[in-house]
Amino acid sequence: MYEQIYNLTRMFFKSLKGNLMYEFLISKFNGKRDPQRKLSLEQIVALNIYRFHFKTGDLKNYHKMIKELMSDKVPNLPNYENFMKATNKSTVFILAFMNFLMEMNRTILKTSFSVMQILLTVR
């Protein structure tokens, strides 16, 4: 299941490449220095979406669970503090990805925001 979510996030971020708002938000996500993270943005978003599968609200316990159960799928998992910082910085992208999933799978429910409108609103 994690692989499916990760593949969807990769497809989502590929579709945003070249967009000026996306480039601006990526520069804010990376900070003034080059990115020091061990996980890519796609992995961070995928792991945070996958958290809903386990129904854990506590990020610390989820981090321990990933470290023990998914060490083969996520071998370069950072320590808890860096994982928490990356999760907090990626909230905008998680919301945009969730909107992307709703748009892909909508039948009756129609959202009024495009992905870029959500990125602008949250930022």
Regions found by a protein language model. Give the residues of each.
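Short alpha-helical elements
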Residues: M1-R123
